[in-house]
Structures are given as C-alpha cells and as structure tokens.
Regions:
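N-terminal post-signal-peptidase region of extra-cytosolic proteins
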Residues: 83-95, 126-127
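Penicillin-recognizing serine hydrolase domain
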Residues: 1-65, 166-237
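Acidic/histidine-rich, surface-exposed loop or edge segments in extracytoplasmic proteins
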Residues: 77-85, 150-155
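Short, glycine-anchored, charge-dense loop/turn motifs used at functional sites
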Residues: 70-81, 100
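Extracytoplasmic/secreted proteins, especially bacterial periplasmic and envelope-associated proteins
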Residues: 94, 99, 103, 137-144, ...
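Conserved catalytic neighborhood of penicillin-recognizing serine enzymes
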Residues: 123-159, 234-237
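Short, glycine/proline-biased beta-turn/loop segments that scaffold the active-site neighborhood
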Residues: 109-133, 221-231
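Active-site SXXK
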Residues: 78, 91-119, 203
Length: 237
C-alpha cells in the first residue's frame, strides 16, 4: 500500500540544517530513477544562515504548528516576518501548481478552448473530473487546477503550452525569474519525481507573485464554480 506519514506531536528539530541540500530520503518508490536516468543534481546552496525558528522578539510560535519549515510573510511588501528552516529543501506536492497556473495565465487567453485527452483525464492523484474527448476553456481548467488541485487539469493545461517538457522548462524558468533558488520542478502537478525540491522561502516568493496577479487572486477567491459537462458527462460544481 501507499506510505502514510506518521502523526506528529511536535515540530521536527531542523537546527542542524538536515535539508540544506536536498529533501530527506523518499519513503516510497515514487522517486525511483528509470534505468539509465542520472541522479538529478540539486540546485546550488545559496543560504548558510540558521535553520531553526527565526522570529522577532516577542513573537510566540503557536504550539500546534508542527511543520518542518514555514514562513510568515507580508504579501504586499514581501517582508518575511517569521520563519523556520526557510531554505530547507522539501517536496512541495500540489502547492507547486502555482507556477503552472502563472505560466498559463501569462501565456494563454482565458477563453481559449483546450481539448482533453485520455491521458489528461486519467492522471493519477487528485482530479477535478474533466472528461476525455471534452473541450474546456483555459478559465475552466484553471479553476479545476486551483480549486480542486486537479492533476487532470494540470496535464491538459501543460499540453496547451507545448507539452510536458515545455511546461517543465517554463515553470522552472519562472521559478528562477522569481528568485526561487532552492527550487527544481520535476513535476508541474506536484506528483513526486526525482529531484523535486522547494523551500518555504521560495514558496513565499511564488505566492506573493501569484496574489499580485488579478486572475489568480480572483480564481482562488471563488466560492464555487460551475464546471461544464459534455455529451453524457454532466456538469458539476
């Protein structure tokens, strides 16, 4: 069966910077290299400061925060107010979808029609529920990506910007443009893949840029969305 992480009752001690270069060893086979595939080289280390809790005087970290790494930042000014292991490298899972969303928003008209393949509709992991053979607007697919964390919508959007390889090149280029020096995106949907890495600091950069984008901010502020159906597949909310 799938590996299930243990329940924590305290935050891990990161004072010794255990994740300074790369995430901890994978606990499943999801990052197993294909035959002949080289081991990815981690991004160069750019931070040599402390890796524990870094807070201003008088700041009390809530007792129920058990994350290995986190950052509290002002989305308007970009100022980081408090943090823990800010440049420690971790697997981002689906929160890395923010980069794909920004690339798509910057590149495609929201009303562009995108056909959906069997490969898109049948992606593993979380799915919004789009149907193979259907056609959806970029706006529809972005809502499925950001509201339902759809790996199916992520795959469909990636094909619309040139395919998997092009999408990975573009999201990694955007990460570098944003100054995300701890980040390597090996999977634009957040599924585990060899070399996948980001940090709390980098994600603060990505989400600050995202919330300054009116289209992104509007989508994630949506309470509900009517997803269209087609043929015998009904629409859904």
């Amino acid at each position: 069966g799938n590996w299930v992480p243990p329940v924590r009752d305290r935050a891990p001690d990161t004072d010794s910077c255990p994740n300074a270069q790369r995430p901890s060893e994978a606990m499943s086979t999801s990052e197993r290299l294909a035959p002949g595939q080289p081991t990815p080289t981690p991004p160069p280390q750019v931070y040599d400061g402390p890796c524990g809790v870094i807070v201003p005087p008088g700041y009390a970290v809530p007792s129920d925060v058990y994350a290995s790494a986190w950052a509290v930042f002002d989305a308007d000014s970009g100022e980081v107010l408090a943090m823990k292991d800010p440049h420690g490298r971790y697997r981002p899972a689906s929160i890395i979808k923010v980069l794909l969303a920004l690339v798509v928003i910057n590149e495609l008209p929201l009303d562009q029609q995108v056909p959906v393949s069997e490969a898109s509709a049948n992606q593993e992991g979380s799915r919004a529920g789009i149907g193979a053979g259907g056609t959806y607007t970029v706006n529809d697919l972005l809502h499925g990506l950001l509201m339902a964390s759809g790996n199916d919508t992520a795959h469909a959007l990636a094909q619309a910007i040139g395919g998997d390889d092009a999408a990975l090149r573009k999201v990694n280029a955007l990460a570098q443009d944003l100054g995300m020096r701890d980040t390597y995106v090996a999977s634009y949907s957040g599924l585990d893949a060899p070399g996948m890495s980001t940090s709390a600091w980098d994600l603060s950069l990505a989400y600050r840029a995202a919330f300054q984008n009116q289209t992104f901010a509007g989508i994630v502020d949506t309470d509900s969305y009517e997803f269209p159906g087609f043929d015998d597949l009904p629409g859904f909310q």
